[in-house]
Amino acid sequence: MARIAGVNIPTNKRVVIALQYIHGIGPKKAEEITEKVGIPAERRVNQLTDAEVLQIREAIDRDYVVEGDLRREVAMNIKRLMDLGCYRGLRHRRNLPVRGQRTHTNARTRKGKAKPIAGKKK
């Protein structure tokens, strides 16, 4: 099992698919990485040499923000919005939808479980 960017990637899958197990790498970036390194798309992880794994690891470290660094960057961006006090920051602070969705009904995922109101009946 190869370890890239702190993630154990599955050995029996194709390299393009296995790279997507890393947070921050999707289908497009996985294809870009394999093209840069020069690995065929149908090659599987267990067929890679140590040198190829090292090349992939270096390409990811050099060109992409992944895993913990990416999570930290996103969290800092949200914190910055909240500190500014802008509309998006206020919505994050109140755990409400940020991108203009309606909240009168719906928005249960963001707001959490419905809170019962005492004495209210139909």
Curated annotation (Swiss-Prot):
InterPro entries documented for this protein: Rbsml_uS13_C (IPR027437), Ribosomal_uS13 (IPR001892), Ribosomal_uS13-like_H2TH (IPR010979), Ribosomal_uS13_bac-type (IPR019980), Ribosomal_uS13_CS (IPR018269)
Official protein name in the record: Small ribosomal subunit protein uS13
A Gene Ontology biological process term: translation
Gene Ontology MF terms: rRNA binding; structural constituent of ribosome; tRNA binding
Chain's gene name: rpsM
Lineage summary: Bacteria, Pseudomonadati, Pseudomonadota, Alphaproteobacteria, Hyphomicrobiales
PROSITE patterns cross-referenced by the UniProt entry: RIBOSOMAL_S13_1, RIBOSOMAL_S13_2
Record's GO cellular component terms: cytosol; small ribosomal subunit
Family, as annotated: Belongs to the universal ribosomal protein uS13 family.
UniProt cross-references to Pfam families, sorted A to Z: Ribosomal_S13 (PF00416)
Function comment: Located at the top of the head of the 30S subunit, it contacts several helices of the 16S rRNA. In the 70S ribosome it contacts the 23S rRNA (bridge B1a) and protein L5 of the 50S subunit (bridge B1b), connecting the 2 subunits; these bridges are implicated in subunit movement. Contacts the tRNAs in the A and P-sites.
Organism: Methylobacterium sp. (strain 4-46)
Spans annotated as Disordered: 95-122
Record key words, sorted: Ribonucleoprotein, Ribosomal protein, RNA-binding, rRNA-binding, tRNA-binding
Subunit structure: Part of the 30S ribosomal subunit. Forms a loose heterodimer with protein S19. Forms two bridges to the 50S subunit in the 70S ribosome.
